[in-house]
Amino acid sequence: MIIIEPCAGLGNKLLGMSSAYAVAQKLNRELIVMWKREVGCNVKAEELFDLPFRVIEISENGYSKEPVAHFRGNQLKKKWRAKADRFLECGDVEAIKKQKGYEGLLAVIEKEPVIYIKSFGPLCELDAASLAFLKPSAGILQKGEPLFS
C-alpha cells in the first residue's frame, strides 16, 4: 500500500498524487491519498475530481478556524502513519531523488509493504498518460459546461 500526502498547493498536489498513482499501478499496490484542505487550496478532492482510489480528507486550516476538523485531521494522519512500515517526509523524498534519482526512490517504495509518503513533487517521471486518470467531478462538469461545449 502507498499512502501519499501531497503538499504545497494544487499544482504540486496533482504532481504528487499523479505520480503516486503511476507508481502504485506499476507496483500493483493500493493507493490512498491524504488530501489536505488548507489555506492555499481549501477544496475537497471530490469537488474537483472523480478519482479511482480512496481519498481521505484532512483539514489544515488551523485549530482556530476548524477545531474539530483540525483535531480529526491530526488523528487521521497519526492513524495512517502508524500503519506504515516507513514514513518519508518531503525532505527525505527530495534527498533520495537527488542522490539516486527516481529509480532509487522507486526501489525504496518497492521495498516497503506499506509506505507513507509526504511529498511536494513527483515520485516518478510523468507524461500525459500519467494524468489520464484525472477526470473532472460531476460538479465541475456542470459548472464548466458552457465553457466545455
Enumerate the predicted regions with their spans.
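A short beta-strand-loop structural module common to alpha/beta enzyme folds
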Residues: 29-40
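Histidine-anchored nucleotide/phosphate-binding helix
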Residues: 14-25
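A short, glycine/small-residue-rich beta-strand->loop->alpha-helix junction that serves as a flexible
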Residues: 6-15
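Secretory-pathway luminal glycosyltransferase catalytic domains
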Residues: 41-149
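Short, flexible loop/turn elements at secondary-structure junctions
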Residues: 8-9, 37, 121
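Extreme N-terminal starter segment of soluble prokaryotic enzymes
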Residues: 1-2
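Structural alpha-beta junctions
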Residues: 25-30, 53-56
